[in-house]
C-alpha cells in the first residue's frame, strides 16, 4: 500500500541532516570550490559518478602553495584550475575575487591530482590537514560534445571539523559578488 507523505508527517521539524562539525560541499563538474581548513580537520573527497579527476591546490596560512599540508605531492601545473578561473562566468569571477582577497596566487602554485578517468563511482579519498590552510578543489572537464557521453561530473566534499564551536558564532554568509561601493551601518 502506497502512502503519500506530507509535511504533516514530519515528527521533529528542523533537525540537522548532518551531525555538528560536519560540512558538505559540492564541487560542480567543470567548477571549483575554495575551502579553509584548520589543523586536524578531516576531509573526504567522493567521486560520486566516477571517471572525474580532482585537481587540488593547497595554500598555507602565509599564502604560499604547499600540498604537503594535506599529505599530497605537488605534481603538475594547475592548468585546469587556471582555465576555470579564466572563464567568463559568474562563478569564475566570484572564485577569482575570493582568491584575490586572500592574496592567493594560483600562477605560482603546483597542483595535485586525485582520481583518474578510470575511477569508479563512489571512490573516496580521505585527507587530514596538518596546519591551517586554504584549499582549492576543482572538478575539471570540458563541455560535452554532442556525440560523446563524458560530461564533467560533481565531486562531494565532506569536512569534519575538529573544533566546530569555532565556526558556531560566525554567520554563514557567502562572500559578496563585488566590492561594496558604500557601506552604511544602522
Task: Tell what function each PLM region has.
Residues 1-186:
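Acidic, Ser/Thr/Pro
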